[in-house]
């Protein structure tokens, strides 16, 4: 992972936490990041749990990278600055990041929401008092959770928060309103609903689309009305991993095993070709400033360009290392960043790849 000090001259869909993959991530003690110390560098083999899972460009041109063990990193184009629980961050397990209309950074963590105004962090835990409520149809409860996996701020200023087990919440700055708590799979061991939300997006009309990774399908929220889309036509399995809106207003939805669906406002179309067979795990979608569609996969060759109705693997020096990619994002210079498991963080300038994966640093 990106394991290092407060400032560095060098240094990535999330690896699903808690109920999404049946594993519980626990906080681990971290060394203080307050002071620079003399150190040597040696190679370090990162494990699968060392994940750089989100990349985000803020309004000032800074890049933010969230991780599953090392908190958050801010990159100003020259140096990386690391924020952990030692600095007030609510948790070192961070799955989502967004900048609000006022320039405040918001993080989705294993301890709920966490806001940062440039000076201090504020924790906004998810509501726990409604967890005991049960479905009016089945009489069964939903899974309790504190973990945020996805986060956006809608055009009306409200936040939409996806959790790892309890569906989604709408947050207006004061009150959380629960959605889709009783969708998704029932855990066979205890008959409790488990709805893991990895993706939330707002379309051009202001409608909210919420994707479930635990077989809850795709939900479209228009005002107070909810429409469910199964996305099962022989390709998909109802596990929505990512969502994206391109410059034409088309929506893209990536699934765990069913490739990508494109929605033009009227029809869902499953996009498949002979290169992928339609059965590839999609983790992230991006349209760059040139109009090129990029797709990341958590399996096989990790990065593709979508050109002429075909997925073309990125094939340059170093690209064979781009496997199990969790996100793709673009910086203010037009460089494309990729990140994922085993601490991977790479930047592509249109010509070559540069590895920003951090080596282990020892005092």
For the regions a language model picked out, list residue spans one by one:
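Carboxylate-rich, polar loop motifs that coordinate divalent cations or form catalytic acidic clusters
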Residues: 2-363
């Amino acid at each position: 992972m990106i394991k290092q000090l407060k400032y560095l001259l060098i240094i990535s869909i999330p690896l699903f936490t808690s109920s999404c993959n049946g594993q519980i991530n626990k906080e681990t003690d971290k060394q203080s990041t307050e002071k620079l110390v003399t150190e040597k560098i040696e190679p370090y083999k990162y494990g699968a749990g060392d994940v750089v899972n989100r990349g985000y460009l803020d309004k000032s041109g800074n890049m933010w990278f969230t991780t599953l063990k090392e908190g958050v990193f801010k990159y100003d184009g020259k140096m990386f600055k690391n924020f952990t629980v030692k600095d007030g961050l609510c948790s070192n397990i961070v799955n989502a990041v967004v900048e609000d209309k006022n320039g405040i950074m918001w993080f989705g963590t294993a301890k709920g929401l966490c806001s940062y105004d440039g000076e201090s962090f504020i924790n906004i835990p998810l509501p726990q008092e409604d967890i005991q409520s049960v479905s009016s149809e089945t009489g069964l409860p939903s899974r309790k959770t504190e973990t945020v996996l996805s986060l956006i701020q809608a055009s009306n200023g409200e936040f939409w928060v996806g959790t790892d087990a309890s569906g989604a919440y709408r947050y207006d700055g004061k009150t959380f309103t629960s959605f889709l708590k009783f969708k998704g799979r029932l855990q066979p061991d205890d008959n409790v609903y488990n709805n893991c939300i990895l993706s939330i997006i707002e379309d051009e009309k202001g409608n909210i689309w919420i994707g479930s990774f635990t077989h809850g399908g795709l939900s479209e929220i228009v005002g107070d009305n909810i429409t469910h889309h199964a996305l099962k036509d022989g390709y998909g399995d109802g596990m929505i991993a990512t969502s994206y809106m391109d410059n034409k207003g088309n929506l893209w939805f990536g699934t765990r095993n069913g490739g990508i669906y494109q929605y033009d406002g009227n029809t869902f179309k499953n996009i498949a070709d002979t290169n992928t067979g339609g059965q590839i795990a999609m983790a992230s979608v991006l349209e760059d400033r040139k109009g090129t569609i990029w797709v990341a996969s958590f399996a096989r060759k990790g990065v593709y360009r979508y050109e002429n109705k075909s997925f073309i693997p990125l094939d340059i020096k170093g690209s064979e290392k781009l496997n199990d990619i969790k996100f793709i994002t673009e910086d203010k210079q037009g460089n494309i960043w990729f990140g994922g498991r085993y601490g991977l963080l790479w930047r592509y300038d249109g010509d070559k790849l540069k590895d920003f994966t951090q080596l282990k640093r020892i005092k």
